[in-house]
């Protein structure tokens, strides 16, 4: 009886360990993504999940909000920033969880949505305008640079509504709460492009927060990101390739 009991316990222990290892292997890839790129990355991830069987979980907010979450220990495997500096800051900070160099994944384009399509609308104070919060969102920061141009000084008394991120800014405009919005092209493909020389380039960088040696799914995902197929999906979404 004692032998049978010991054997039964050994089998239970072996089964428990196997199940534990199985659950470890089945953990989803956890990704933090800037709001402007969320929908594009969701489409990319849908194909990755279908072809590999690996699950991906997205958390989306403005770049500044996500940076604060990561700095305070939020458990992400990779971070897609809407700018270059934030990703580089994580990659170079010895106290951060970054596990590799930051890399460019897309170049953003700022557009003016609404009205008659003329950029001169920005000079009219009667036109209310939505932008993302420039303190936490790179597209909002770029928008403020554009609004600071001399030819738009007459519009400085306009109603300016700041969304927590570009998605909320888009919603302000789309629902009619504002007349105009300065947005990423990916959210309003038919809107009027802002000349690139009017603001610093919106270079969107990502950085891995887990080591690929410990996370084989992340290694496979990073390879997938560099494929021509994914690059084509990013371009189709309204972004430009990295220079």
Language-model features, listed with the residues they occupy:
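Short beta-strand elements in bilobed, periplasmic/extracellular small-molecule ligand-binding domains
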Residues: 56
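Exported/periplasmic ABC-transporter solute-binding proteins
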Residues: 24-51, 59-60, 64, 68-72, ...
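Bacterial N-terminal signal peptides
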Residues: 9-20
